[in-house]
């Protein structure tokens, strides 16, 4: 395997070729940094968190594919993943995971002690998550915790503490993550039932759209509470209204429960997250 082929394999393993997950992690993290700073965050902290999000997203993908390597080959969407297809060995994948994990931890060591402690919890959660799909019908709810963990870390890095405002944002992102990852799980539902992978899409069954809607509403209310706690104004409110618009569009997409529209609904959450971040940023600027 030449260098170009190796890079292609690593890119697919870490999803560098599919940045949607990184972006969905990035928007709430940036929102947390902006809220914690009351505007523009410390540049050093900002750079560390942006790089950290990219690295930890890659780590999460590697450990997820390692855990699912024997199941992914039976699922249409995942059968070509490098570990499932045998393009890379488990030993090499785990080595890459360790290298990237150490790099992320090295970045964290540039910040304060509270962030370091929170980061240890974060990496443990990242490792545990892929295996929850074997034992619970609610892995998306565990993922919501994993994908929201950068929020208290961001507040800790910027202010040295984690106030109530941070937990409102944490709750908002948790509800939102469960909603959009259930859309994602709807894409694989038929295959998951065959191979024994558990998900909220399976758990919610025929009530999936309604329950996703409730989670979207809960996310909105918590985003409102986070903004209220930080005394945010009109432009943040416009960002929230745009979020509502995107959420409504996603409900239309998943109405027929077909694979392609459900995946499109999942991808659309990137724009919902961008709208929230832009609204928040504009509210501080203007």
Swiss-Prot record:
Source organism of the structure: Shewanella sp. (strain ANA-3)
GO cellular component, one term: plasma membrane
Its biological purpose: Catalyzes the prenylation of para-hydroxybenzoate (PHB) with an all-trans polyprenyl group. Mediates the second step in the final reaction sequence of ubiquinone-8 (UQ-8) biosynthesis, which is the condensation of the polyisoprenoid side chain with PHB, generating the first membrane-bound Q intermediate 3-octaprenyl-4-hydroxybenzoate.
Official protein name in the record: 4-hydroxybenzoate octaprenyltransferase
UniProt pathway: Cofactor biosynthesis; ubiquinone biosynthesis
Keyword Magnesium attached: yes
E.C. numbers: 2.5.1.39
Keyword Ribosomal protein: no
Family: Belongs to the UbiA prenyltransferase family.
Key words of the record: Cell inner membrane, Cell membrane, Magnesium, Membrane, Transferase, Transmembrane, Transmembrane helix, Ubiquinone biosynthesis
NCBIfam families xrefs: ubiA_proteo
GO terms under biological process: ubiquinone biosynthetic process
Cross-referenced PROSITE patterns: UBIA (PS00943)
Cofactor(s) needed for function: Mg(2+)
GO MF annotation list: 4-hydroxybenzoate polyprenyltransferase activity
């Amino acid at each position: 395997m030449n260098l170009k082929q190796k890079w292609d394999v690593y890119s697919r393993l870490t999803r560098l070729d599919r940045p949607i997950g990184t972006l969905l992690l990035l928007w709430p993290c940036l929102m947390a940094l902006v809220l914690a700073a009351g505007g523009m965050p410390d540049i050093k902290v900002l750079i560390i968190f942006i790089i950290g999000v990219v690295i930890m997203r890659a780590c999460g993908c590697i450990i997820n594919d390692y855990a699912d390597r024997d199941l992914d080959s039976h699922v249409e969407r995942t059968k070509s993943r490098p570990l499932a297809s045998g393009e890379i060995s488990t030993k090499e994948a785990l080595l890459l995971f360790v290298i990237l994990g150490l790099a992320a931890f090295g970045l964290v060591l540039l910040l304060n002690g509270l962030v370091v402690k929170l980061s240890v919890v974060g990496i443990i959660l990242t490792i545990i998550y892929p295996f929850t799909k074997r034992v619970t019908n609610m892995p998306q709810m565990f993922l919501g915790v994993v994908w929201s963990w950068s929020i208290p870390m961001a507040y800790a890095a910027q202010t040295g503490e984690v106030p109530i405002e941070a937990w409102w944002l944490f709750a908002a992102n948790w509800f939102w993550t469960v909603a959009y990852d259930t859309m994602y799980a709807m894409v694989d539902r038929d295959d998951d039932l065959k191979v024994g992978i558990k998900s909220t899409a399976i758990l919610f069954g025929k009530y999936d759209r309604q329950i996703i809607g409730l989670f979207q509403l809960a996310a909105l209310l918590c985003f409102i509470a986070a903004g209220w706690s930080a005394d945010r104004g009109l432009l943040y409110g416009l960002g929230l209204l745009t979020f509502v618009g995107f959420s409504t569009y996603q409900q239309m997409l998943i109405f027929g429960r077909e694979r392609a529209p459900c995946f499109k609904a999942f991808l659309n959450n990137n724009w919902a997250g961008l709208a929230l971040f832009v609204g928040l940023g504009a509210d501080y600027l203007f």
